[in-house]
C-alpha cells in the first residue's frame, strides 16, 4: 500500500512539473554536508547577496553553488562586500571556476574533472567514562560528548585518529560521481576502514538521478535527516533546477526543489 501511495505521489509531482523546460542542465557532484561552503552561502544569503536559495533540501550541487556565487557577484557590483565576506566569496569562486566558466559560456565542452577535492586528518580525544561526569546516578546512555555532524561514526574511548579523502567530479555533462574513503583507529575498534559516502549521479531530462550512499539534510531543520546520522544508501530523484509552481494543487509551494527518495 505504501509503495503504491509513494508511486502515486511521485507520478503526481512529475505531472505537476511537466511544464519544466526540456533542456538538460549540467550534472555535477554534490557538495558534502560537512563542507564549510554551506556556512559561507548562508552568510552571503543573510547579508543580502543571494536571494534565490530554495530552503530545506541539502546537499546542494557544485553547479548550484556556482550559480549563487555569480548572483552574489552581480549584487556586489552595487553593494561592496565586507572583507571577511569577500574572502569567503573568493575561496568559493576559485574552487568553482570550471562550473562558473560553463555557466558563462566560456567553456562549451565540459570534460572530465574528477579529482581529489579534500583531505582531512583529525585527532580527537573522547572520555567515555560515566564516572567522569557529575551525576548522582548513572544513566542508560552511551557517552559521545561533542560528537556531532560526524555521519554517525562513534568515537572510541581515549585517542581517535581519523583520516578521509573526498574524490569527486563529473565524467562528462551527464554523469558525475563521488567517493569518500575513511580510516580511523582507536583502542576500542582498532583500525576501521569504510566508505563514508559514495554515489553516482546522472539525469533523465531535467530529473537528476542519484544512486548510492550520502548524507542528506531534509526539512527546515536537520531533525529527521542530517549528517549526525549514518548516511543511507538510497535512490534519489530530484529536479536539477528548482521549479516555480505557478498553478495547480502545489501552487502554495512557490519555488521549490522536488525530491523523492527510496
Functional labels for PLM-detected ranges:
Residues 33, 93-179, 256-260:
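Transmembrane beta-strand segments of Gram-negative outer membrane beta-barrel proteins
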Residues 168-261:
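Outer membrane beta-barrel
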Residues 55, 150-156, 186-189, 224-226:
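Outer-membrane beta-barrel domain signature
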Residues 1-9:
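Bacterial N-terminal signal peptides that target proteins for export
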Residues 4, 14-16, 20-53, 64, ...:
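N-terminal propeptides
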Residues 30, 34-37, 58, 62, ...:
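Solvent-exposed, acidic/flexible segments
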Residues 24, 49-51, 146-150, 220-222:
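Glycine- and acidic
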Residues 30, 54-56, 76-87, 104-117, ...:
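Short loop/turn motifs that connect adjacent beta-strands in outer-membrane beta-barrel proteins
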Amino acid at each position: 500500500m505504501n509503495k503504491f501511495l509513494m508511486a502515486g505521489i511521485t507520478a503526481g509531482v512529475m505531472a505537476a512539473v511537466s511544464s519544466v523546460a526540456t533542456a538538460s542542465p549540467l550534472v555535477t557532484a554534490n557538495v558534502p554536508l560537512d563542507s564549510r561552503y554551506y556556512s559561507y552561502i548562508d552568510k552571503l544569503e543573510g547579508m543580502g547577496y543571494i536571494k534565490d536559495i530554495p530552503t530545506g533540501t541539502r546537499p546542494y550541487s557544485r553547479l548550484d553553488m556556482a550559480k549563487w556565487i555569480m548572483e552574489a557577484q552581480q549584487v556586489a557590483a552595487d553593494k561592496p562586500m565586507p572583507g571577511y565576506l569577500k574572502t569567503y566569496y573568493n575561496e568559493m569562486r576559485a574552487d568553482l571556476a570550471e562550473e562558473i566558466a560553463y555557466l558563462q559560456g566560456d567553456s562549451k565542452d565540459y570534460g572530465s574533472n574528477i579529482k581529489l577535492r579534500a583531505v582531512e586528518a583529525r585527532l580527537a580525544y573522547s572520555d567515555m567514562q560515566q564516572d567522569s561526569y557529575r551525576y548522582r546516578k548513572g544513566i542508560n546512555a552511551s557517552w559521545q560528548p561533542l560528537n556531532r555532524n560526524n555521519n554517525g561514526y562513534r568515537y572510541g574511548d581515549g585517542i581517535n585518529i581519523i583520516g578521509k579523502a573526498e574524490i569527486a567530479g563529473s565524467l562528462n555533462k551527464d554523469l558525475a560521481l563521488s567517493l569518500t574513503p575513511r580510516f580511523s583507529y582507536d583502542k576500542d575498534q582498532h583500525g576501521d576502514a569504510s566508505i563514508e559516502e559514495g554515489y553516482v549521479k546522472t539525469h533523465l531530462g531535467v530529473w537528476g538521478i542519484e544512486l548510492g550512499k550520502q548524507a542528506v539534510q531534509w526539512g527546515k531543520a536537520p531533525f529527521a535527516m542530517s549528517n549526525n546520522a549514518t548516511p543511507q544508501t538510497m535512490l534519489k530523484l530530484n529536479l536539477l533546477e528548482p521549479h516555480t509552481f505557478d498553478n495547480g494543487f502545489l501552487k502554495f509551494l512557490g519555488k521549490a526543489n522536488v525530491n523523492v527518495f527510496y
